[in-house]
Structure formats: C-alpha cells, structure tokens
Curated annotation (Swiss-Prot):
Residues 909-1074 form the Exonuclease domain. Residues 1104-1131 are annotated as: Disordered. This is PolyA-specific ribonuclease subunit panl-2. Residues 1104-1115 have a biased composition (Polar residues). CDD domains: PAN2_exo (cd06143). SMART domains: EXOIII. InterPro entries: Exonuclease_RNaseT/DNA_pol3, PAN2-PAN3_catalytic_subunit, PAN2_N, PAN2_UCH_dom, RNaseH-like_sf, RNaseH_sf, USP_dom, WD40/YVTN_repeat-like_dom_sf. It comes from Caenorhabditis elegans. One of its GO terms (biological process) is reproductive process. It comes from the Eukaryota. Residues 489-864 form the USP domain. GO terms for cellular component: P-body; PAN complex. GO terms for molecular function: nucleic acid binding.
C-alpha cells in the first residue's frame, strides 16, 4: 500500500490493479487520462486499446484493436476522437471503438511518438526514421514532411507553446522551430538514449542512459535552463529514473517515476520485486516533496490526470497500478458527459390488441411439453443404414491357396496406401486405373517451417542486460547469461569474425592432441594464429566461472590477415574458411605430424591410363565431396574423401606427351588419431544433399517419414510466467511457470528417458576403421557397444560445429554453435556452447540434425581412449629483450636490457596504455565498417617508478584506417606511428604482446588506472590476483569513477595531463597513488577522505563529453570483497 502526504494534506493510496492480459501476456505500452471525459485509456504492445471508467471502479467502457502487427506507441484524445499511433499508421476512432479514419504514408515506417499541437488540428509524428511528419486530421492530409539530419530521429516529442522538442536514440534533445522544424539548438543530455523528458516554461528535465562499455541508466534527473541552454545542477534519485514529467502548478513541480533494474537480495525473480516509486517535488525546493513506493515489475508507461488526482503506472507484465490522493477522486475538473450504450429493451408487460407497432416476437413463450405442429413425424426420424451393394464377380482376381489378390484401383492416387474399396453406382462407368506411370516416384513434398529453440538461437549482444523500454526488439523474453553451470569458459562475439572463430577455439581446446600442439608453440611471427590460440588457452584456467566471457579480438585480426574474408558467402563460407585456416596453421607448426593422416598419392593420365608418379603426402583436414553422390552414408563419404585426392589440373603426360587431366587416387598408409572432417558447407549442393539424406536416415521418437525432423527441447526462458506466481491454486495443471525456473533441473530433464529405439541418426557416434593394403573401410558401430574387432580401430565422435538457421525452407544461416562430448564416464551427455550460453544435451539430441535449421560444418572423431598429456612451453624471457625498431631513426629501446632487471614475482609494476581510434571492414559480414580502439603506445615502469621496463609505440598495419589519433588524450600524433617519420621506438603489436605475457608469466602485479580498459584493448587476459586498479580502489560505494588527473591533484597535490597524456607519467603516478591509498587506509581515514573528495567534484555530470573525471571501465569490484585483497601489504 502506497501512502505519502501531498501538499494538500491528503495521502496517496493504492486504488486498483488493472490487468489487461487475456490469454497471453501483453506489455502496457502507453497510458493516458482523457482530458475531456472521465475515461482512462490503455494501449498494449499487441495493438489493443482499452478504456476504463475511473469514477466507477475502473469498469471497462470500450475495447478495440488498432493493429494486428504492431503495438500502440501513443494515445492522443481529442474532443470527439481518440488517435492511436502504431508502427505505420495513425488511426482515428470514436471513444466507443468505431473506426473513423486512418492515415498511412510511405514516410511512416518505424513510428514511435506523436504530439497534438494545442488549439490546432495538427499532429507532429516521429520515430526511428529520419523524418518528422505534420498531419492535419481535419483536412485529412499530410501538410509537411521534414527531413532530419543523418542518424537523427525523434522517439519523443514535446511542445511548450513556443518551440517543439524532440529526443533521439543518441541521448540528444533538439530544440526546433514550430513553424519550419529547423533545429535551433542541440542539447547533449545523455550518452546513449533519452528515456523521457518534459518541458515547462523555460525549464527542461531529462532522464536517460549513459554508455560506459555497458549501458547504465543515469541515477539522476538533468535540468536545463532554456533561456541560456545551460545545464543546471542535476537532482539525485534513490533509484534509476524511468519517467520525468512536470505537473502543471504555480511552482515548477516535478513528478518522477524511478525503479531499480535488479532484484532485491534474497528474493526470487518474480514480477513484483523490482523496487520502484513515485516522487513529487518542487524543482527549486527539494524539501516540499511527496514520495511513495510501488510494487511492480519493469515499468513501461506512466501518466497522471489533468487535476493531479490520479497517477497510473503500467508495467511489462500487463498490469496497471493506479493511485489517488483522495477518497472521491476525479479525472478532470469539468468533464463532458460520457455517452453510454442504450439499455436493452425489455419485453412489454401488455399492449392493446389493436396496437400494430408491437411485434408478437417480443412476447417470451415457455417451452411446451406437448407435441408441436412443426415436429417431424416419427417414421421420418428413424435411423436407416444404406444397404451394401451386392458383390460382383471380379475378372482380375488371382487365388493363391486360400488368399485372393486383386489390383488396387487407387494405385496412382493419394489413397494408394489406404485400404479403401471405392463405391461405384450402377449408372457410373467403372474406369480402371492405368499403370503407365506406376513406376514413377512421388514428387518430394516441401518441408514445413520449424521453430528453433532458444538454446540454439543467436544470442543478443550483452551491451545491455536490461531490456530497453523503447526498442525495436521483437523478443521480449529476458535472457540470462548465468546458465553456465558446467563451468566452461565462454568467449564474447564482439564481431562477425569472433562469432565464427570462437566455436573452433572451443573444439581445438577440447581435443588434447591439438591443445598440446598449440601450448607447445610460441614464435615472433606477426599474425600467427597458433600463437593467439596459445595465449587464449593459457588464460582458460583462470577464467573458469567468469560469466563475462573472454575477448578474442587478436585472434580475429590474425584470421583476417591470413586471408579469411567475410565480405561474401555468409556464415557457411566464413565457417569453412576459418576451419581450414586455423587447422592448416596448427598443422604447419606441428613438426611431428601428430594430427595428420599419411597417404601414397597416385596420378594416372585419363587419356592413356598411364601411371605418372607416386608421392607421399599428408592431410590433416578431410573435405567431403558431394558432386556425383545422390545417396550415401556418412562413412561412405569419409571413405571417398580418404581415397580421392585433390584435382591436380592439366599437366603434361610423360607417356603420351600431351596436356591431360590427371586422375588422383590415394592409398592410406596411416590414419591420424584425430579425424577432422570438413563438411564443405560452402559448396553448392551442401544443403540439398544433407536434406535428401536426412529424409532417409534421420528419425526421432514420434515421427515418420513426413515428420521425421521434429522440434528441439525448449529452453526455460520460452515458458511464460503464471500471473498468480507461487499463489496459483492449479499448479499441477497450469501450463505456466511458477516462480524461479530451476535451470539445473531443466537440464536434467533433457537427459532423462532418451534411450528410445525410434532414434536414428545420419551422424554415427562411433565408427570402426579397418585398413588393408591402403584401403580403409569404415563402419557405423554406434549401436554396438561391445564391438571388438582386433583389426579395427574405433573412433568416437568428440566434437561438432553446427551451422544454425532460422527454420525456414529457404534457410538463412545466422551463426554456428559448438557441441562437445563430455567425459567417458557420462559419455551420453553433450555440452552445447552457443556463444555465452552453455547447456547439457543428451547424445541423441546432439547428433540430431535438421536441414531447415541445423547442419554440421565440422565433425571431429578421436581414437578411442587416445589422449595426449598436455605440456605447456614456458615463454622464454629472451623474447622480452628482442629488439626490433621498425622506425628508420635507429633509436634503441628504453626497455630493460638484461634478465636481472626484469621484475620478480609479486613485484609491483606501473602500467598504462594510450589508444587511437581506427576503422576496418575486415571483421564484419558483408564488408560492414566498424570503428574501434587500438593501442598506440604502452608503457611499464618498475615499483620505484624511476626505471622504464618498456615504452613502445605500436606500428599500424596497412589494412586499418585511423579515424582519430585522440592526441588530446593519448599524446600520439600521426608522425609517431609512421616508420619513416617516427622519432619513437616503433614495434609490432605481437612484440608488445610477448613482453606483456613474459611479465604475466613471471607473476608480477600490475598497478594502473582503469587497467581493465587497457587489457581489453590489448586483448591480454590477466588473472585478477595480478591486477590492482586504482579506479576501483579510490571510489566511494557506487558513486562515479574518478580520473587519474583529478585524484593526483586532490590526494597528492600535483598536476599532470595538462597538455596531453603521457603513459610513462600516468604509470608512475598510478604507483604513487596506490602507495598513498595504503597510507590513508592504514591510518583509517580512507572513508572520510573519499567523502571529502566527492564533495568537491568540479562537475556533477557523469557525461564523458562534459567532464574529464569519468573513467569508462567494464569491471566493478564485488560488494563482498575488499578491492585491495589482491595487493601486497607493503610497497
């Protein structure tokens, strides 16, 4: 129950919860109190509009549907009509739900907001398109369309009587001339998106989202003076503000709805445990305020009545909570009378016998028990069966012993499989079926669309784990990234290249022969793929249980610079390219050839059939070829790939002395312990071949030939929550979920009752290989667990990469996923890794494939009980001392020159890096250009700060283009990174990484400011125990993070970074700041000192563009740990 005292002395009280849900959950998209009549309007995300009577216990007045394909984005009541805005249409309807008019335009594509200009018949409409539309509903035409600037849109529109105000998705508010919509001024309010804003007089208030690696809502209300377009002091809120509106009054009174996006500690994730509230206060005086809490889920709509008696708050679960400040509240001071439907006409009690205006049908009559004149006679209502036609003698009957056989007259029809005898009437001619086309096969039926489980769907980006209130997402399910209960290390898919490459990294790490090769290799070659895998594999042990996922940007760059192109071909082509490039590079570094099969290659001329030459070759990746094959098992395809070599092209025959194509055949001398099978996913007949084979071989329980390809198990997030929650009385029969989903229990269900005989798979789990005189014979022994043939070698399916599509017949492949077999003890269980979602599957579900959404790109078979003991090679310390100045100045490095000078274990070093902004089209599909940060300079000093361990500038490659050198913040200019003009020590990114990994391997402790930002851009993975980040140490609670320049000035009393940043200076002062931190903490003055610092901040705005104090970082110190635990006790 909400209770708060208002300025009239009354109390706000909870009036009623309004549920707009019927059979499905509908999000409340907008609410509006009618300013003309006593009505309350609700719009939903499914295109439905409902009106209620607030003064009559919120009984329903009318309800109608305005769109079947879009939600209701805006409600604008006028005197006679109610206007509703959907994605592509503005519809006018009477308050009783009768359609009057609708307006559509080619300019209306993704509409989001509308504003009725007071005193006129004009609407201004905007949305996610770059246009503003003026529409006159009296003239029923579009009077003006204003083209906005590039990347500018209008998702919120307001009017203050003088100017029009719009907000876009980039955090800007535009002040526009109401006559011609020209921009007068632009206010940069928030870094990412404006959630809500309002204007009254010359004041503007906003609330929104800032971008700090992850999107975070600003926990304050920003205020602007429109006379000077100047930002005033912001107003702090207890939680994250969602809506901010002016309440018209003599003073500037503000009403704010706030809410936290996280559940309260100790509570389950039900719909009502997101703390929220409404706060009303005077803008110039926070003392005169009223506040009350709300029990609700995520808030999606807000409004108050014209006389401020009612406040309504809607949420994403379809519930509207209404509050009032008095016992008899009204919607408006002077409302028009609402038109109600006429009451039903009751039958007259009596009327005159000569009254011709009355009808006898209006007189109700009782049901008579006596027979009526209209009753059918009894003899006409008896059940009579049709007499069977007498049997006729058949001329084409053959008798065998006691059986009689006759030709099926429906042999060429759809009923040929049904035991149906046609019924012929005497007057009809009996036509026997022709047998001319009896041998032809039936045309294949088109495959139906199938729903893809969310276990396999492409995961949304983790830039914002709270669903945006105003977004275009069609998936309203709240996803979670805490499903990694199997403790696998996951990786982030920041670009298209990472999306595909991460799946192969998981497979390579799971196969011990490949993992052993990778961990034994280290070199100084630029863009070495195996080195990048080595760096990732060494960091896996320290990242187990980290749900944030590892970054693999350096691996993506290495793949792009080794010839992998995403500009054409889509996911299938990219997957095949990356598989071949990575496996080829790993095999190149393997001197022993432990993952290669050995062959004798024979070339024979197709003209004279003469044998040309014989040579020994090796192959580490078998590519399937589908060209001349119509139907074959997977074992037969693998045999073909083993024995048929690559096309050698036309060469001169030694016997017939003519240019001729050579037929290549191979004899197997030795099979590799690991068979890596490339399914050749980018070939033309790939999808057609697999669909044809699956229709013959693939089965699952409950299916037949026409429906053999069934559905996959649904994920818990696909189940809808019951609106009654744990209080539901019909939990046993209710089809909805009650309370928190037990994800481990859901995974256990996927592993139960799976060994059914109806399963059949095209991909065998075990194959037996027999080698005799160079010929390999493969057999599927999946169903023979006791198979024991002395001459056969058993290979077990250990890993797979599958391409996942959208489930359509004309499939669109979206991304790959990884499937790994678990330990032999529980070998029936598989692990599905879909980006950062990790789940268990049983063997049948893992091997089940479907041509509409799931086909294999890589199959990895490993010899039974074969394992390689992994031994990691230590990175030599000599690699740190390797000198390679790429600049032409001949300058020697400032780095230490002897191993004795390198820091020891647990020794502190100061580290800082400077970045530049670049753009490239190598990492995304279809050549899409992306901008990112790249390291331009990195510096490290010893614990005293006097000796430089290294200070390197990084040379840029030719495949990137610099957008901005960020000289003001990095101190780097164009000449510093050019080999011909640089006066610095210039090296490669690979050399810098080797120096970093030598220090990590030696166990040093890195001290710096916002170190996680540096490690993210460098793409270096460091254990948390080796990191001391002063940006988290010198922070008060959840307050904003402070810059190194400000902390040094306030704590050390020194001034740095006046002209440009110097990474050596920053590294030294980070060490000094950490020493001072230990000194203050030992004296017990840390809390008071931090409170003092936060009271003297020069700029209260956390916007990075307006204050130099903010540091963008993606890591936060957990609340239950001490940030200094990883640091040594003394310096």
């Amino acid at each position: 129950m909400a209770s708060a005292t208002t300025n009239q002395g009354n109390e706000w009280r909870f009036v009623a919860p309004i549920n707009i849900n019927t059979t499905t959950e509908n999000t409340v998209s907008c609410v509006k109190f009618d300013p003309h009549e006593d009505l309350f309007w609700i719009g939903s995300s499914t295109g439905k509009v409902t009106s209620l009577l607030p003064t009559n216990h919120f009984t329903r007045y009318s309800a109608f549907v305005v769109s079947n394909i879009s939600g209701v984005h805006s409600l604008e009541p006028t005197e006679s009509l109610i206007f509703t805005l959907s994605d592509t249409m503005l519809r006018a309807t009477t308050r009783q739900g009768i359609p009057v008019a609708k307006f559509t335009s080619p300019s209306m594509t993704k509409m989001a907001a509308s504003c009725h200009m007071p005193g006129t018949s004009t609407f201004i409409m905007g949305g996610f398109q770059e246009k503003l539309i003026h529409y006159d509903f009296v003239k029923e035409k579009e009077i003006r369309t204003t083209e906005l600037k590039a990347s500018e849109n209008a998702i919120i529109i307001r009017y203050n009587g003088t100017n029009t105000f719009t907000a876009d998705t980039r955090g800007n508010v535009f002040v526009k001339n109401s006559k011609n919509c020209e921009t007068i001024h632009t206010l940069d309010c928030h870094q990412d998106q404006v959630l809500d804003f309002d204007v009254q007089g010359n004041k503007l208030i906003t609330c929104g989202v800032s971008m700090n690696r992850l999107k975070n809502m600003d926990q304050f209300i920003k205020v602007y003076d429109l006379r000077m377009y100047k930002a005033l002091s912001p107003i702090g809120m207890p939680y994250l503000p969602q809506f901010a509106r002016f309440m018209p009054s003599y003073c500037e009174r503000v009403c704010v709805t706030y809410q936290t996006m996280y559940n309260q500690p100790g509570q389950t994730a039900t719909w009502s445990n997101h703390p929220a509230g409404v706060k009303m206060f005077d803008l110039n005086s926070n003392g005169n305020s009223a506040e009350f809490p709300i029990e609700t889920s995520l808030i999606s709509a807000f409004d108050f009545s014209s006389n401020k008696n009612f406040i309504a708050v809607g949420n994403h679960c379809g519930i509207v909570n209404v509050f009032a400040d008095r016992d008899q509240p009204q919607v408006n001071e002077n409302s028009k009378e609402t038109v109600f439907a006429a009451p039903p006409v009751q039958p007259p009690l009596s009327f005159a016998i000569d009254d011709t205006t009355q009808t006898f049908g209006s007189i109700p009559l009782g049901f008579s028990q006596e027979p009526l004149v209209s009753d059918w006679p009894t003899e006409l209502t008896q059940i009579v069966y049709r007499r069977r036609k007498p049997p006729t003698e058949q001329t084409n009957v053959k008798s065998i012993h006691y059986l009689s056989q006759i030709k099926n007259p429906r042999i060429n029809s759809k009923l040929k499989r049904h035991n149906i005898v046609p019924y012929f009437f005497e007057q009809e001619e009996l036509i026997e079926a022709s047998n001319d086309h009896g041998s032809k096969e039936e045309a294949p039926q088109e495959m139906k669309r199938i729903k893809v489980s969310k276990l396999y769907k492409k995961r949304p980006l983790i830039v914002n784990q709270v669903p945006a209130r105003r977004g275009n997402s069609q998936d309203e399910t709240q996803e979670t990234y805490t499903w990694n209960i199997i403790r696998h290390v996951t990786m982030q898919s920041t670009h298209g290249m990472n999306l595909v490459a991460n799946t192969l990294v998981q497979v390579a790490y799971s196969l011990s022969p490949i993992r052993s090769i990778v961990l034994r290799h280290i070199c100084t070659e630029d863009s070495c793929i195996t080195c990048e895998l080595h760096f990732l594999f060494t960091a896996f042990s320290s990242k187990i249980g980290d749900n944030s996922g590892m970054l693999t940007n350096n691996l993506a760059w290495a793949l792009a610079r080794n010839g992998v192109s995403l500009k054409a071909g889509g996911v299938l082509s990219a997957t095949q390219q990356i598989i071949k490039t990575v496996i080829d590079d790993v095999a190149r570094t393997d001197a022993s050839g432990s993952i290669c099969s050995k062959f004798d290659r024979h070339l024979r001329c197709i003209r004279c059939r003469g044998l040309q030459q014989q040579e020994s070759v090796t192959d580490h990746l078998l590519k399937l070829n589908y060209a001349p094959v119509y139907q074959a098992s997977l074992c037969q395809l693998i045999e073909k790939s083993l024995h048929i070599g690559d096309d050698s092209g036309e060469i001169e025959c030694e016997d017939c002395k003519q240019m001729s194509r050579m037929e290549c055949k191979r004899k197997v001398r030795e099979l590799s312990p690991v068979l890596l099978i490339d399914t050749n996913a980018s070939s033309n007949g790939f999808v057609e071949f697999w669909r044809r084979q699956l229709s013959l071989f693939e089965r699952k329980p409950g299916g037949n030939r026409s429906s053999a390809l069934g559905t996959v198990p649904e994920s818990p997030s696909e189940k809808k929550n019951c609106r009654f929650g744990t209080d539901c009385r019909n939990k046993k029969t209710c089809k909805f979920v009650h309370g928190l989903v037990d994800w481990p229990a859901e995974q256990t269900k996927l592993l139960e009752d799976v060994d059914l005989p109806e399963w059949a798979h095209y991909i065998p789990s075990r194959i037996a290989a027999q080698l005799c005189e160079g010929i390999v014979r493969l057999s599927d022994v999946s169903d023979l667990p006791d198979y024991d043939e002395p001459s056969a070698v058993i290979y077990e399916l250990d890993a797979m990469i599958h391409a996942v599509g959208n489930g359509e017949n004309d499939v669109n492949w979206t991304h790959p996923v990884t499937l790994l077999r678990e330990s032999p003890v529980i070998s029936s269980s598989w692990t599905l890794i879909n980006e950062q979602l990790v789940s268990r599957l049983h063997d049948h579900e893992a091997r089940h494939i479907d041509g509409r959404w799931k086909l294999p790109a890589l199959l990895a078979y490993k010899k039974k009980n074969f394992d390689v003991k992994t031994s990691e090679d230590i990175i030599s310390n000599d690699l740190f001392l390797a000198e390679e100045n790429l600049a032409s100045n001949g300058m020697t490095s400032l780095a230490v020159q002897s191993l004795e000078e390198l820091p020891k274990e647990k020794e502190l070093v100061g580290l800082d890096a400077e970045f530049i902004k670049i753009k490239t089209d190598l990492l995304e599909f279809d050549g899409k250009t992306v901008q990112m940060r790249a390291v331009g300079r990195a510096s490290c000093v010893d614990s005293t700060g006097e000796r430089i361990i290294f200070d390197d500038h990084v040379k840029l490659t030719d495949d990137v283009e610099v957008v901005d050198y960020l000289t003001k913040f990095s101190g780097i200019v164009k000449a510093d990174l050019c080999p011909t003009t640089s006066e610095k020590y210039l090296t490669t990114h690979k050399r810098l990484l080797l120096r970093m990994h030598v220090l990590i391997q030696r166990g040093v402790t890195f001290v710096g400011h916002a170190l996680h930002n540096d490690f993210t851009v460098l793409n270096v993975h460091v254990a948390e125990s080796q990191i001391i980040d002063t940006v988290t140490l010198m922070r008060l609670g959840t307050q904003r993070m402070l810059s190194l320049q400000f902390l040094v000035k306030e704590i050390l009393g020194e001034t740095i970074q006046m002209e440009a940043h110097d990474s050596v200076v920053d590294a030294r002062y980070a060490l000094k700041l950490y020493r001072k931190y230990l000194e203050i903490k030992e004296q017990g003055l840390l809390g008071s000192e931090m409170r003092r610092i936060y009271t003297i901040l020069p700029c209260p705005s956390p916007n990075q563009t307006s204050s130099p104090l903010v540091v963008s970082t993606t890591r936060k110190t957990p609340e239950d740990t001490n940030p200094a635990d990883a640091a040594p006790k003394s310096v």
